[in-house]
Each structure stands twice: as C-alpha cells, then as structure tokens.
Amino acid sequence: MTEVFIYDHVRTPRGRGKKDGALHEVPSVRLAAKTLEAIRDRNGLDTTTVDDIIMGCVDPVMDAGAVIPKAAAFEAGYSTRAPGMQISRFCASGLDAVNFGAGKIAQGADDIVIAGGVESMSRVGLGMSGGAWFMDPSVNFPAYFMPQGVSADLIATKYGFSRTDLDAYAVESQKRAGHAWAQGWFDKSVVPVKDQNGLTILDKDEHMRPGTDMQALASLNPSFQMPGEMGGFEAVGIQAHPEIERINYVHHAGNSSGIVDGAGVVLLGSKAGGESMGLKPRARIKAFANIGSDPALMLTGPVDVTEKLLTRTGMRLADIDLFELNEAFAAVVLRYMQAFDIDHDRINVNGGAIAMGHPLGATGAMILGTVLDELERRDLNTALVTLCIGAGMGTATVIERV
C-alpha cells in the first residue's frame, strides 16, 4: 500500500448561517473556489497534476448542487483536466472526502488529491435535500428516527448529563475558541473571503461568543422539548430505550453547534506526487474507519467507530495525543469523554462547533486541519479525528506527523 501524506490544508472563516451573516451573499461554489485557489497558490500546484477533487456537501441542491468541486475548480482557474466528485455522509462528509482520497492514493490510483467540503447553510437550509429518513415512514418508523436534537437529549438522559454539565462544556468551548483566535493559532490556515474588488468580507469565525457565561446560557429555553413532547418523538425514543422513563430536555442554542457557512480542503498525496512538486509532508494518514450505530441515540457513532479503529490498528487510547470531535451537541462530546475516560485537556483543545459553528459538509476537513496545526504547535505526534453522523453512524481518522 502507498503511504498517504497530508501536505497542507486551508479553510474559510465560518460565517453565521443566516441572511444577515457575512457569507450569505457568497454561493457555495465560490466558498469552495476560495479554498482551491488558496491551496494551489500556497503550494505552487500545477493543477494539471491534480488527480481528483473530492468535496462533501450535505445538502447538494439549488446553488449547492451539480458537483460543486468541478464547478469550483473552474471558478478557481484550475486546469480542465482536474475532475471533481461530490459526496455526502451527512456531518462526516468532509472527513470522508479526505478518507476517500486517501484510499485512492493508497491503492495507487492517484498521486495528488484535494479533499474537503463546503456548506452554505444560510443559502441552502438544513434538510433541504429531503430524503427517506425525513419523509418515508417505511424507513424512519422501524429505525426510531428522530430529530438530532431529541437524540442528543436522549443521550444526555441515558448517560446522566445535566444541563449544568452541558452548559459548562459550552462555556469552555467558547473560551478555548476565543483564546485560540486571540493567540493567532488559526491564522496560518484560515483564508479570508474577499469580494470581487478585493475587499475582505470575513476573516474570522463569526459565530463565536467568547464572553458567554453560565448565567447567559441559563436564560435560554430548551430547543427540542416541543418536537419531543408535542411531535411525539419522546415516545419514539422511550420505545427504543425503555430503560428511560422520560427525556430531560437540556440542549439549547448555546450548547449545540452553530449553523454557519464555510469551506475547507486538505491537500493529499503520495510521496512521489509530493516530491514531483517540491512539497514537504506534514503528516500521514495512518488509518480510518466507518461504522453504523444505534439510530435512535444516533450521535454515539464516534464511540463505536473509535473502538473499531483502535481494534483494527492495535492502537491504544494512550497512543493518541489529541482528539477532535465535532461538537454537534455538548452531550456528544461528554459521552465520548465518559466512554473512554478522556481528560478535557486532550479533546477539542481550541474549541469546537458550539463556539465556531458546524458547516456540515466542511467540518470534517476543518477539524482535521485544526488538530494538525495543534500537533505541530505543541510538538506532539498523533491525533484522532471523529464525527457523529445523522441516522446513526460514525467516521474516524488517525493522523501522525512525519
């Protein structure tokens, strides 16, 4: 098998996913093109040598449809020889794009792949692509399918996390993200988004509220009590998990991930591919895995896939220096830390999606890049990146510095 190296990564800032968000007027294809331009220019890429561009997008409809990476490559001025492929595994799409690219390189099919993702949630709303999970009772009834927020509250109830636990985690996420930005730790990987006149539209994650405290969060009402109780989904959850008498509704806007716009890509290659363009590898893809998990709990896949990946590789938790897990909801991370007895100082050390937002198809690539930068900054070696996924799945990737 051919070794797969990470040569570079970039991302846009995350803009608030609303009509008054800074990136609302920037279509998905342009967000993706900004990252393709940056990864090319930073590394002096000859784009005729790019074997594939793979990007995740969870809702590829309207102006986010029709194979965004190929359109973005045209927008960015790439050679017409560079192909593109759009994928979706819900929230893990960006990381799975990286894993798909790594697999192609490992098999010797490709030498240079750009992989990542994009989502403009202010322009294409969550769930706009529809699908059987949401609309077909022959699928969602037997699967005990529920809105993700109700599943997150089910996790909190089942594993004993209080609202105070979740809010304390959210406050820390905000503090860590604010501190990392203030220290300039994101500067080398974040590419400002500019308009056609070269004026900066956004150069910093827009969703953050680093001054958030417990008192402010205490004023927020639970977000998922109405669909749980009035929509009948609490009964679905209890049917799936009869050990639970009632769901405690503890998630709200302040301890759940932010809806945002953004894009990110990772430059992957074989040793020969990198050497042909004078690139220096920063890390290697050591292993990756996917798994299905309980569809009612839905968001516990990171625990299951981490166990699978460690078993497959013979690695131990002690071999991992840092962990990155998408903060879809605070209970997701708390359950992961509980399951593996991981100290908070090893996971999401620069904050996460509660603070900075979760641009669905892009997040996996973004957090892989974030943890690589942090490994380098701390002079550490190995990281595990994992994401929970709608419908009950998990994806994980292990990287190590070279």
Place the predicted regions along the sequence by residue.
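Glycine-rich loop/linker segments at domain edges
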Residues: 9-12, 16-19, 102-159, 226-229, ...
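N-terminal extracellular/periplasmic Venus flytrap/periplasmic-binding protein-like
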Residues: 10-13, 24-34, 42-44, 168-271, ...
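Conserved catalytic cysteine-centered active-site region
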Residues: 27, 57-111, 131, 143-150, ...
